[in-house]
A protein has these predicted regions:
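Glycine- and Gly-Pro-enriched alpha-helical subdomains that act as flexible
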Residues: 189, 196-218, 223
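Conserved alpha/beta cores of soluble small-molecule-handling proteins
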Residues: 1-189, 193-194, 222, 227, ...
Length: 270
């Protein structure tokens, strides 16, 4: 089976230095407290960012989303967006990285005085971790495409846990991924509470029919940066794109389909 996140292994990753709260640690010594909110509860937000030719792609959009998500869960990040950007660039510079790099920026609510969910039990500033890795997607994934299947696990409504949030709690997507893998497919095509196609477990879904592009309304999927860029490119080039509800039956009559993501870029669906 393939995956939208298949990558070429790189020996240099064994020696990377990871940023944790302003300090750098070798990969094999980088760690956080067992009382950290992210570890105990999945309480936090994150973003995946790419470094290409020494430039962080769409960094302003990534940091805006991160901050918007943090505000939505009442998490106040003590570093400004500019300070976070500088920290990421510093991390890539210390690692002498220039391109083909994927960066995971993680912000948890911080350390707890005891393992309990109430944010009032947090006794530290938010934990900020920056993990940079040399990561090039597998070429065969782009050539062969990936296979999708619908699953029983759905994207929940906003009043359960807002599916637009890019939170550390990814169990909903993990369960969908497990279902898809157990069925011998590469990734899950997830529905919303109304039975419409919403998104995939780790990428965003688009299909093409009669030279028109379709994607979901965005109500039940993470606010994808690459997804929005594809939408913008379509509009700029006068390609008709519909953000609307649609069913599996609509997908099955599509001329072609693809998925998008920061790491995945654009991958065809078989």
């Amino acid at each position: 089976m393939s995956s939208s996140h298949d990558y070429i292994k790189d020996k240099r990753n064994a020696n990377i230095k990871i940023y944790i709260n302003g300090y750098f640690y070798p990969r094999n010594k980088a760690s956080i407290s067992v009382f950290d909110s992210g570890f105990l509860l999945g309480d936090g937000v994150w973003s995946g960012i790419r470094l290409h030719n020494q430039k962080l792609l769409f960094i302003k959009e990534h940091l805006k989303r991160l901050n918007d998500d943090a505000k939505q869960i009442g998490l106040k990040i003590h570093l400004s967006k500019k300070e976070l950007e500088k920290a990421i660039y510093k991390t890539t510079k210390i690692n002498k990285m220039k391109s083909d790099v994927h960066i995971r920026l993680v912000v948890s609510r911080g350390i707890k005085s005891t393992p309990y969910q109430d944010p009032a039990f947090t006794i530290s500033k938010p934990t900020i971790v920056i993990i940079p890795e040399y990561k090039k997607p597998q070429e065969k994934t782009y050539k062969q495409g990936i296979k999708l299947t619908t699953v029983k696990t759905i994207r929940g409504p906003e009043n359960v846990q807002d599916p637009k949030l890019n939170s550390l709690s990814k169990l909903n997507c993990i369960l969908a991924c497990i279902e898809a893998k157990n069925k011998k497919f590469d990734e899950a095509l997830m529905k919303d509470p109304n039975g419409n196609i919403a998104t995939c477990n780790s990428t965003h879904f688009f299909y093409i029919k009669n030279k028109k592009v379709y994607t979901s309304t965005g109500k039940y999927c993470v606010r994808g940066i690459t997804r929005q860029n594809v939408i913008n490119i379509c509009k700029k080039n006068k390609i008709i794109i519909h953000q609307k509800n649609f069913k599996l039956s609509d997908v099955l009559t599509a001329d072609e389909a693809f998925v998008t993501g920061t790491f995945a870029n654009i991958i065809p669906v078989k």
